[in-house]
Amino acid sequence: MSRIGKQPVPVPTGVDVMIEGQKVSVKGPKGALDLTVAEPITVSRNDDGAIVISRPNDERRNRSLHGLSRTLVSNLVTGVTEGYTTKMEIHGVGYRVQLKGANLEFALGYSHPVVIEAPEGITFAVQAPTKFTVSGIDKQKVGQISANIRRLRRPDPYKGKGVRYEGEQIRRKVGKTGK
């Protein structure tokens, strides 16, 4: 049996979970999220009030969906209680970020400023001209927006300039040697 899938998802106080067939709806202090679980997987509540994910048989596809579904439901519960945050930083001379309303405006060495609009459920915060955070309750959305921002100017392997996650180690290359 899936080691991750067989563990029940604890539901903290203040979180309301609705299960209707394959659809799981979670409401908490930070907001509400929905998830439709893949077909062979079933979702139910146990006596403790925890969410239990089960599969009908041990087919390969069902085994893989079992752990995935449990993790996705767990991410919903964590999202509506704590939320998710990605810390990012910018390295490079003249590279900076500023908050314009709810949107981020980047100066990344292009001939124009790059504006990233905040989608619904995502908030940006700027701590310094080179440090900012992406926050929200949906883990997938926070990660996707962070990846899109990083893609604006990927870290350069020679000088390390660009947008990166906080604490990310960039593999550096040695430049050409002169004669």
Swiss-Prot record:
<keyword id="KW-0699">rRNA-binding</keyword>
<comment type="subunit">
    <text>Part of the 50S ribosomal subunit.</text>
</comment>
<keyword id="KW-0689">Ribosomal protein</keyword>
<dbReference type="InterPro" id="IPR019906">
    <property type="entry name" value="Ribosomal_uL6_bac-type"/>
</dbReference>
<dbReference type="InterPro" id="IPR020040">
    <property type="entry name" value="Ribosomal_uL6_a/b-dom"/>
</dbReference>
<dbReference type="InterPro" id="IPR000702">
    <property type="entry name" value="Ribosomal_uL6-like"/>
</dbReference>
<comment type="function">
    <text>This protein binds to the 23S rRNA, and is important in its secondary structure. It is located near the subunit interface in the base of the L7/L12 stalk, and near the tRNA binding site of the peptidyltransferase center.</text>
</comment>
<comment type="similarity">
    <text>Belongs to the universal ribosomal protein uL6 family.</text>
</comment>
<keyword id="KW-0687">Ribonucleoprotein</keyword>
<dbReference type="GO" id="GO:0003735">
    <property type="term" value="F:structural constituent of ribosome"/>
</dbReference>
<protein>
    <recommendedName>
        <fullName>Large ribosomal subunit protein uL6</fullName>
    </recommendedName>
</protein>
<dbReference type="InterPro" id="IPR002358">
    <property type="entry name" value="Ribosomal_uL6_CS"/>
</dbReference>
<keyword id="KW-0694">RNA-binding</keyword>
<dbReference type="GO" id="GO:0022625">
    <property type="term" value="C:cytosolic large ribosomal subunit"/>
</dbReference>
<dbReference type="Pfam" id="PF00347">
    <property type="entry name" value="Ribosomal_L6"/>
</dbReference>
<dbReference type="InterPro" id="IPR036789">
    <property type="entry name" value="Ribosomal_uL6-like_a/b-dom_sf"/>
</dbReference>
<dbReference type="GO" id="GO:0002181">
    <property type="term" value="P:cytoplasmic translation"/>
</dbReference>
<dbReference type="GO" id="GO:0019843">
    <property type="term" value="F:rRNA binding"/>
</dbReference>
